[in-house]
A protein has these predicted regions:
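Intrinsic low-complexity, intrinsically disordered or marginally ordered coil/linker segments
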Residues: 1-236
């Protein structure tokens, strides 16, 4: 999984910046509390994150009008087809395991039917079937983020799945008096970009083409040690 370094530049009056910091940074520990900014929906938080694909496939098998009776009411064919396509597309886009969703699971476990249905409901409502996937999509990882470097009105922190674009966008919305510049890069320059927020609104964004000159330039700024290592390797 990619390590993505995120950097925030905060501009505004010192009282407004301190208010923002106090609202999201855990006292005595340099950690951004993402849950204070963009909390996990309660419906997702109450669902176990494990075995989502299996549970969903068991439920789809039970309600598939083309399978045997599993003591659960069958869905109309058009509704079943819609849900099946939704789930296949989700897993294809997110982890490439769309082939694991069959709608004809060999031995569907009745104990998974309820969770499978709830997970599909959450996928339709929130774009994710469980809290783990939701956190990856919205926070950039499963947990809060440690701030590994702090300068004057500048933070650097790491996420492990995606850049924390949505959570920082929400932070800007909650603190319109603070101008926020957010940039991020993965090592090697594959995932690189930036967003600028003023008055709580996104006013500029950039998504660099993977491995492009702009991407490598920003990657070197956020991973200065990688550039230093490269230069040392080139020395005679």
């Amino acid at each position: 999984m990619h390590e993505i370094r995120n950097e925030l530049h905060l501009s505004g009056s010192q009282p407004n910046i301190e208010k923002l910091i106090n609202s999201v940074v855990t006292p005595n520990y340099p950690m951004i509390d993402f849950a204070r900014i963009l909390p996990v929906p309660d419906e997702l938080a109450s669902l176990p994150a494990g075995m989502s694909r299996v549970k969903i496939d068991c439920y789809l098998t039970a309600v598939n009008p083309g399978t045997a009776d599993h003591h659960l009411k069958k869905l109309p064919a058009d509704e079943y087809d819609r849900l099946f396509r939704l789930v296949k597309e989700y897993y294809s886009n997110n982890d490439g395991f769309n082939h694991c969703i069959t709608g004809s699971y060999p031995y569907p476990d009745v104990g998974y039917f309820a969770d499978g249905k709830r997970m599909i409901d959450c996928l339709q409502k929130y774009g994710a079937p469980n809290w783990g996937d939701w956190c990856d999509q919205n926070w950039g990882q499963l947990t809060n983020s440690h701030i590994y470097e702090i300068e004057y009105n500048k933070w650097r922190f790491v996420t492990t799945a995606n850049p924390s674009i949505k959570v920082i966008g929400k932070l800007a919305e909650l603190n319109p008096a603070v101008r926020i510049y957010h940039r991020w890069a993965s090592l090697g320059g594959r995932i690189v970009g930036s967003c600028l927020y003023e008055n709580g609104q996104l006013i500029a964004e950039q998504e660099c083409a993977p491995f492009s000159e702009d991407a490598i330039s920003m990657e070197e700024a956020l991973f200065p040690e990688s550039r230093a290592d490269y230069c040392e390797q080139q020395e005679p």
